[in-house]
UniProtKB/Swiss-Prot annotation:
InterPro entries in the cross-refs: Dictomallein, Peptidase_M66_dom
Presence of the UniProt keyword Zinc in the record: yes
Signal peptide from the UniProt entry: 1-20
Protein name per Swiss-Prot or TrEMBL: Dictomallein-2
Molecular function via GO: metal ion binding; metalloendopeptidase activity
Catalytic activity, EC: 3.4.24.-
Annotated source species: Dictyostelium discoideum
Length: 599
């Protein structure tokens, strides 16, 4: 019996010895998408808050791994949910993709291979293996990459043609209405997303002979008919941005991740094209010139929540790399060109020859790139349209998508991402704070129907028949969405928003009151009333006094930009802005008409 026991122990130890010998040792495993990051993702601690960058799901990735014996053949097997998805053979280090402009190699020790996007998903497992070594077949431990959300970045392009700008004297609509496939492919490589869908907005374009500027920088609201009349360089773009935010709300997209960008084409006092020489962006929208180059990607960075990198660095190091540079960032990777993007400025870059005047210099005497969000345009190789973001900035972009509501067109339902379970879940939009932020998170109640978009401006200080600040822009007809609206002639609906009652939406008017109504008259003489969630009251005092500066023409308190979408099942004859203070009490038969326009 004792001999049998000794024999079993020897066999057991021999089995363990063989197994130990057959375990393949692998190190420094990385995934390259926008940036080359560890398989477990990358984290930063910023002011006591952890920021994390994950691998993006449903996006191809270059797999990199280092092995002790570089001369063997290595394979990576992808597993999912207990089943084998597929296997790829890794290229040896001599075949590692090059660096832009034939720069320094990323590594001399990494084997590599491209993993198809279909294999990159939450729950995937990777196991490496080798054949032909002195130990025979060797397999590694199973590794679990930190794969996160998969999502498509959807973007509307809505050109603004102002002051007589048209296809002939500026740029043709065929070029400004969207971005071509080449640009889209490069943007996907720069943005942390699974895919990009950029289309012309359903409105197609906005073509107005004049533009109403809100009070800004100590100047009153004004109507301008050429770009030279603006008081500062960003004034018109600021007004365009306000309209884009308004449209996102009108179309029920304010809680979504859908972005909107407007190429701005306008004429100066002599009827010539006037460049924007810059851009503005934020809160899912951006505007600038029509070229879709550095300004465009910078402003859409702001649209996704990114600040200027240098300013964030100076502000308690909320950006981790010196002066808004990429000094310390992981390298980038472009799968379209199958090459690495160093954090240093390459020889063919526009700014290469003069970069040492202003750039940070690395330990090898090279100029370090700046982030796209801090003067980085021009730091890229001449083959690229755009320069790089820092790896850290991908955390903000990823969070932008994690916090959004998604509409699933396949089943007509909504979903959100749960970052703990790493999965989408069915979601029903809710009304927050009793309607203070709108109803059902301002999601549409009808989609893809014929609509009119009505946009207006109103000044509380403009005298009747003097000036044109209080006006209604030309109607915009398109296919679009409708959100929940309230009719001030319907008592039941008004009771639901009455701040004095305990209705479902009793805080709907809490921001500034509900003092205005849009009235639409159709050619069949029927009427439609839409209560606006806008007023002239102090914040959270819907029944209280007016805002302090409501009579100051230089204050935003005296100006209102508003709009609604209505179904285009009838032809509109007239649109009016009515003064309907405390509209929840009902409106008079003959309310004061503040603005009127016939069509």
């Amino acid at each position: 019996m004792k001999l049998i026991l000794i024999y079993l122990i020897l066999v057991f130890n021999l089995f363990n010895f063989i197994n130990c010998q057959n375990i393949l040792k692998v190190s420094n495993v990385r995934f390259a998408q926008t940036h080359v990051i560890p398989i477990e993702g990358k984290s930063w601690n910023i002011q006591g808050s952890t920021k994390h960058m994950s691998i993006v799901g449903k996006r191809r990735a270059l797999l990199l791994a280092s092995f002790q014996d570089q001369n063997l053949s290595y394979f990576a097997t992808i597993w999912y949910d207990g089943g084998k998805v597929g296997m790829i053979q890794l290229n040896d280090p001599s075949q590692l993709p090059l660096t832009e402009d034939n720069g320094e190699k990323y590594s001399k020790v990494h084997h590599s291979g491209m993993i198809p996007k279909e294999w990159v998903r939450v729950g995937m497992k990777i196991q490496f293996s080798s054949f032909g070594g002195i130990n025979g077949t060797e397999v590694s431990d199973i590794l679990s990459p930190d794969v996160g959300q998969d999502y498509t970045l959807k973007m509307w392009i809505l050109p603004f043609y102002l002051f007589g700008a048209n296809d002939t004297n500026t740029q043709p609509f065929s070029k400004t209405k969207g971005i071509d496939s080449g640009i889209s492919k490069e943007l996907i490589e720069k943005w942390s997303c699974s895919d990009l869908q950029a289309d012309n907005h359903p409105i197609q374009k906005i073509d107005w002979p004049y533009f109403v500027m809100e009070p800004r920088s100590g100047n009153p609201a004004m109507v301008i008919t050429n770009s030279d009349q603006k008081k500062d360089g960003y004034a018109i773009m600021n007004g365009v941005l306000s309209i884009l935010w308004l449209l996102r709300g009108m179309f029920g997209e304010s809680s979504s991740s859908i972005q909107i960008y407007s190429p701005l084409l306008h004429l100066d006092a002599k009827g010539r094209y006037a460049d924007t020489y810059g851009g503005l962006g934020g809160s899912s929208a951006g505007t600038g010139n029509h070229r879709f180059t550095g300004i465009f990607i910078h402003e859409q960075g702001h649209a996704m929540g990114l600040p200027h990198a240098g300013e964030a660095y100076d502000n308690k190091r909320k950006y981790p790399y010196k002066q808004g540079s990429l000094s310390g960032s992981e390298w980038g990777f472009d799968a379209n060109h199958n090459e690495f993007l160093g954090t240093f400025i390459p020889p063919t870059a526009e700014l290469y020859k003069t970069c040492k005047k202003n750039s940070i210099i690395d330990s090898k005497g090279r100029c370090v790139k700046q982030s796209v969000m801090q003067s980085g345009a021009g730091d890229q190789s001449s083959k690229y349209r755009y320069s790089m973001f820092a790896d850290f900035e991908m955390t903000t972009i990823q969070n932008y998508f994690k916090n959004s509501i998604y509409y699933d067109e396949t089943n007509g339902k909504y979903k959100k991402w749960n970052d703990t379970s790493k999965s989408y879940y069915a979601y029903k939009p809710i009304t927050k704070e009793k309607g203070f932020e709108g109803v059902d998170e301002n999601t549409p109640i009808e989609r893809n129907v014929d609509i009119y978009s009505i946009i207006f401006t109103y000044s509380t200080v403009e005298k009747p028949k003097v000036g044109k600040i209080s006006q209604i822009y030309p109607l915009l007809k398109s296919k679009g969405n409708l959100i929940r609206q309230f009719d001030p002639t319907n008592k039941k609906e008004m009771d639901s928003v009455n701040p004095k009652l305990n209705g479902e939406f009793k805080w709907y008017c809490n921001s500034s009151g509900c003092d205005y109504t849009i009235r639409v008259t159709f050619y069949d003489s029927s009427l439609k009333h839409v209560l606006l969630q806008q007023g002239k009251r102090k914040y959270k005092l819907p029944t209280g006094s007016f805002r302090d500066n409501i009579n100051d023409p230089k204050s935003s308190d005296s100006f209102m930009l508003g709009g609604v979408n209505i179904k285009a099942n009838k032809k509109i004859k007239k649109v009016e802005l009515l003064e309907t203070p405390f509209a929840w009490n009902g409106i008079p038969k003959n309310p004061t008409v503040l603005v009127s326009k016939s069509f």
